[in-house]
């Protein structure tokens, strides 16, 4: 398994791109953490990866053998603001190779709810098993938009990380909490999901209660870590 990582201390951004191209389609993990990646630079990296994925897709008999393709992508702790401008939406289109996408601690959400909606809708075209959007700036409306526009028939996700994405308001993140509750109540939309991480969001007691009811009422084995869901008093699950 080949691993390619970008370090600003050891190489320039151009050298990193050249290294990716030279390694070819046998690279399986790419990391560019704490690299000051903005939308433009992220797009340049992803354009390079699209070419590598295309090389693997042109020879399907080589999947997992001499040309595994990039399966794990980590762009954590950067300055990415837009799912579309950065190329994150485009890389999901018919991508059956990428299985883990780590984009926590960026600035995603700044481009607005339509940008978030485009990313959520693109989830039906890929085979992602793990998606980490922790500590971005989706906000209440943005988080609700993401959840509401995930495909009705479900995704391939096993783990979904959405912690620390909403901000304290007078009413709490009520819209996001109810969208999450509806999502967890749908056997189709959350099919296959093993864990969803929601801690650090400002759902308020009413929001937490709605999510807790959805979890307790669902027959799916879904492990959840959510704000205030540790050691919940039994009364929180009482009928409304």
Where are these regions (language model features)?
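Leucine-rich tandem repeat or coiled-coil scaffolds
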Residues: 1-240
């Amino acid at each position: 398994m080949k691993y390619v990582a970008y370090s600003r201390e050891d190489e320039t951004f151009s050298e990193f791109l050249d290294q990716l191209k030279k390694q070819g389609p046998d690279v399986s993990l790419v990391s560019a953490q704490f690299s000051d990646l903005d939308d433009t630079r992220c797009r340049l990296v992803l354009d390079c990866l699209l070419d590598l994925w295309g090389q693997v897709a042109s020879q399907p008999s080589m999947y997992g053998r001499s040309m595994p393709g990039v399966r794990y992508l980590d762009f954590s702790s950067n300055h990415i603001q837009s799912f579309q401008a950065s190329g994150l939406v485009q890389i999901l289109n018919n991508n059956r190779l990428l299985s883990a996408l780590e984009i926590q601690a960026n600035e995603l959400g700044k481009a607005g709810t339509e940008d978030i909606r485009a990313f959520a809708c693109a989830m039906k075209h890929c085979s992602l098993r793990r998606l980490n959007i922790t500590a971005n700036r989706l906000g209440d409306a943005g988080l609700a938009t993401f959840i509401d526009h995930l495909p009705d028939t479900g995704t391939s996700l096993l783990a979904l990380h959405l912690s620390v994405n909403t901000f304290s308001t007078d009413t709490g993140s009520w819209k996001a909490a109810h969208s999450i509750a509806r999502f967890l109540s749908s056997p189709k939309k959350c099919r296959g999901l093993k864990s969803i991480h929601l801690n650090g969001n400002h759902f308020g007691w009413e929001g937490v209660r709605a999510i807790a009811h959805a979890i307790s009422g669902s027959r799916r084995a879904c492990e959840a870590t959510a704000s205030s869901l540790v050691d919940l008093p039994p009364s929180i699950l009482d009928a409304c």
